[in-house]
From Swiss-Prot:
Family: Belongs to the flavoprotein pyridine nucleotide cytochrome reductase family.
The protein, known as: Cytochrome b5 reductase 4
Species of provenance: Rattus norvegicus
First-listed, main subcellular location of the protein, grouped into a coarse class: endoplasmic reticulum
Gene: Cyb5r4
Location of region: Disordered: 1-27
Keywords: Acetylation, Endoplasmic reticulum, FAD, Flavoprotein, Heme, Iron, Metal-binding, NAD, Oxidoreductase
Keyword check for Iron: yes
PANTHER family linked: CYTOCHROME B5 REDUCTASE 4, CYTOCHROME B5 REDUCTASE 4 FAMILY MEMBER
Length: 520
């Protein structure tokens, strides 16, 4: 329970208490309607001063913010800075001030139970009330585990001085399920920020928060079903993992901590974790490139973010060989729709087979039903780089096309500011062009998309562009839709191609902030 001071609200004798089953509205100034408020919240203004971050708020801190120009209110465990909302509150500023610096949950429920406050005040969210968990009985002697929290003495303090606030977690249960809740203290957490693996009643859940990784790693105290669900409440930065019990017994505790449990460290310092994925299909795309489909285990939740890669691992002549590959969609045409919320259990890869190579021939020899080890996502591409971009240019050579697939998908389905996206695709011959037919169908389907091919060893019949990446080719290709339109460029291919391309882009006066080079 929250021990936060409560206030009488509405005040005795106030219009809101006198009115039967409701409240009297207070006349608002011009331009202070609910629609005006929603417009203001979409303006991008920072209403909390936390720049999108979330904090844990103590009772003492909450009490300090009790003035009209600095008013925090706690509703159902979450703290909001309602100062910007004062002039927009239909019940008037004075009534809102009754809960200033206090827990307004009961007051809110009495008058506003029907209101979707999470949506209306989401831009005012400061964070979550700090709650001191109760200590239940130990699961096993000598392993003291709190109700979803390890004692501070057992937690490695790996949080650097700079970086996001350390997350926390808790858990609760019903007769048939156990729910683990991770409080990330950051807004805009997505399903692809969460990776969950359940194996032999060992739970491993990783939340990627900016450039850090928070890990829950527990040997569960009881058996659970292999299927589970993951839910993300983006605007409050909350992750819920719901496990189904095998037996309807009451758990005294969640379980025992395993390696690196409750750790929060820079992502670059975490090791790769692999799970076994089954080969479901493989089909020819070109004379030397295949489309591989791998199925995740039913006890895994993993979605690869746009433009990021994973590592595939095989045992070759007694040695483990690891190679990075960027997942793609099954097809350029079928995937251009809103994604479903349920996790996708299949991962697709476009992989060129090198007959003299060590890894790809072994991969190509796998039979349907065989297994490949797949790591979690890696990479530094962030879709936030594409925010408000109007002209997107993609430069790809060979299988450097693969990261462009998800970038292209995201651009055409989620970027409302986009005027055009152009792909310049470098290959040796026409036979090497991956998904050429699909690219041309997509260009017909969506007029914002345009593709140009450049061949280094074309046939005599080829009428298109030829050669290698050059200043002349790029200066002609990189034409903005408007003189001052916001642009972004992605480039991927063999290292010499990428390095030369970035050098040429700099020569053409594009800045580092406008360029992303994909490297593994």
């Amino acid at each position: 329970m929250l021990n936060v001071p409560s206030q009488a609200f509405p005040a005795p004798g106030s219009q809101q208490r006198v009115a039967s089953q409701g409240r009297s509205k207070v006349p608002l100034k011009q331009g202070r309607s609910l629609m005006d408020w929603f417009r203001l919240t979409k303006s991008g203004k920072d209403f909390t001063g936390l720049k999108g971050g979330l904090i844990e708020v103590t009772e003492e801190e909450l009490k300090k913010h009790n003035k009209k120009d600095d008013c925090w209110i706690c509703i159902r465990g979450f703290v909001y800075n309602v100062s910007p909302y004062m002039e927009y509150h239909p019940g008037g500023e004075d009534e809102l001030m009754r809960a200033a610096g206090a827990d307004g949950t009961d007051l809110f429920n009495e008058v506003h139970r029907w209101v979707n406050y999470e949506s209306m005040l989401k831009e005012c969210l400061v964070g979550r009330m700090a709650v001191k968990p109760a200590v239940p009985k130990d699961c096993h002697e000598g392993k003291r585990v709190l109700n979803g929290m390890l004692p501070k003495s057992q937690v490695t303090d790996t949080l650097p001085r700079e970086g996001p606030s350390s997350p926390s977690y808790d858990w609760f249960q019903t007769e048939s399920s156990v729910t683990i809740v991770i409080y990330t203290k950051q807004k805009n957490i997505n399903l692809d920020s969460v990776i969950v693996d359940l194996q032999d009643d060992s739970l491993r859940a990783e939340a990627v928060i900016k450039d850090h990784s928070y890990l829950i790693h527990i040997g569960l105290s009881h058996e659970v079903q292999e299927n589970f669900s993951v839910r993300v409440i983006e605007n409050v930065g909350k992750i819920e993992i719901v496990l189904q019990k095998k037996e309807t017994v009451s758990w005294k505790c969640l379980g025992d901590p395993l390696e690196k449990h409750d750790s929060f460290i820079p992502k670059k310092d975490t090791g790769l974790y692999y799970r076994q994925c089954q080969l479901i299909s493989k089909e020819d795309v070109t004379h030397d490139t295949r489309l591989f489909c791998l199925m995740l285990p039913p006890s895994t939740h993993l979605q690869v973010p746009v433009g990021q890669h994973v590592y595939l691992k095989l045992s070759v002549t007694g040695a483990e060989i690891v190679k990075p590959y960027t997942p793609v969609s099954e097809s350029l045409l079928s995937d251009f729709k809103e994604p479903v919320l349920s996790p996708n259990k299949y991962i697709y890869f476009l992989i060129k087979i090198y007959p003299a190579g060590l890894f790809t021939p072994e991969l190509d020899r796998l039979q349907i039903g065989d297994f490949v080890s797949v790591s979690g996502p890696e990479g530094n591409f962030k879709v936030s780089k594409l925010q408000e971009v109007e002209d997107l240019f993609l430069l790809a050579a060979g299988t450097g096309f693969t990261p462009m697939v998800t970038v292209l998908n995201h651009a055409l389905t989620h970027m409302s500011s986009l005027r055009k996206v152009k792909l310049m695709f470098f290959n040796k011959t026409e036979d090497d062009i991956i998904w050429r037919c699909q690219l041309e169908k997509l260009a017909l389907k969506d007029k914002r998309f345009h593709v140009e091919y450049v061949l280094s060893a074309p046939s005599p019949e080829w009428n298109g562009k030829q050669g290698h990446v050059s200043r002349a080719l790029l200066s002609e290709f990189l034409q903005r839709s408007l003189e001052n339109s916001k642009v972004f460029l992605c480039i991927c291919g063999p290292t010499p191609f990428t390095d030369e391309g970035i050098r040429l882009l700099h020569d053409l006066n594009f800045s580092d902030d406008e360029i992303h080079g994909f490297t593994a």
